Amino acid sequence: MDIFKELILKHTDENVLISPVSILSTLSILNHGAAGSTAEQLSKYIENKNTPKDDKDDNNDMDVDIPYCATLATANKIYCSDSIEFHASFLQKIKDDFQTVNFNNANQTKELINEWVKTMTNGKINSLLTTPLPINTRMTVVSAVHFKAMWKYPFSKHLTYTDKFYISKNIVTSVDMMVSTKNDLQYVHINELFGGFSIIDIPYEGNSSMVIILPDDIEGLYNIEKHITDENFKKWCSKLSTKSIDLYMPKFKVEMTEPYNLVPILENLGLTNIFGYYSDFSKMCNETITVEKFLHKTFIDVNEEYTEASAITGVFMTNFSMVYRTKVYINHPFMYMIKDNTGRILFIGKYCYPQ
């Protein structure tokens, strides 16, 4: 969650959405061509962020496996100057994730990249690049993701109604509020020193689900953002139990108008030697080369039938006795994760401003 935490510090009052799996996959591609301290930094970061230690095998393969979900398309690619001759061993490892281009033809290269991203995301992300890349660009890494999964228990369209969404205590807007009643879902209410919050796990068909973290206080999301870590998230989710839930959840759609440039964030997290003078990609080619851009863009559409660009898991149990139903109203800023049934987070975002 380190990249996500860095981003939300920079985008305090904005919707944020990233795919950790996609970013990690792209870093793994770079690692195939890295040497020296660049390879050491990449390998260490990937090992720490990849499969949990107790699930790791003994091989040294650094590729990030994308777990099975309903339909998950990852768009990760490296674009490099056509004037550079790359090692055959590197090209063999990365296969279709590499393409040479003429960066002097900036507009054509921009359109080439955007068309590829559009194809890989089924048209949900139309343009990764809004402006041409500088003609002195030697290498660009792009990352885009598309996922679509049907809800295990779809929301009833005829129950959707217009309701209030509190951006803050003083700012209110309206949203289309979806309703799902009498479903047995994984739920827990957590009390921490920094505030209380609810966690609910909403399953999709297959092996994925969406986890919502909803603060009790309308303006309480900031405190959760400060304390969210992989360890805390696992600890909180370990307390989930099955409850009968009446769920009120807004329809929402998020598409970044501009891609995130993750270069400064990755540098802050210790990956200083992928960029600039000290980068060593000598396993890619014999020339000195460095990463100029690391772009990442995502899209999500949550409605009554499905979530597009996200995925996560749920456990369901039948209770035959009389049950008190918990009502969960998601009517103010919240955090959400989309994970598979191994616990790996495919997407993580916060929603604070209806578009």
Curated annotation (Swiss-Prot):
Keyword annotations from UniProtKB, A to Z: Host cytoplasm, Protease inhibitor, Serine protease inhibitor
Highest rank taxon of the organism: Viruses
One of the record's GO cellular component terms: host cell cytoplasm
Main location: host cell
Pfam family, one: Serpin
GO molecular function: serine-type endopeptidase inhibitor activity
Sites marked Reactive bond: F320, S321
Annotated Gene3D superfamilies: Alpha-1-antitrypsin, domain 1, Antithrombin, subunit I, domain 2
PROSITE patterns recorded: SERPIN (PS00284)
Subcellular location: Host cytoplasm
Function recorded in the entry: This viral protein may be involved in the regulation of the complement cascade.
Family label: Belongs to the serpin family. Poxviruses subfamily.
Protein name: Serine proteinase inhibitor 1
Protein source organism: Cowpox virus (strain Brighton Red) (CPV)
Taxonomic path: Viruses, Varidnaviria, Bamfordvirae, Nucleocytoviricota, Pokkesviricetes
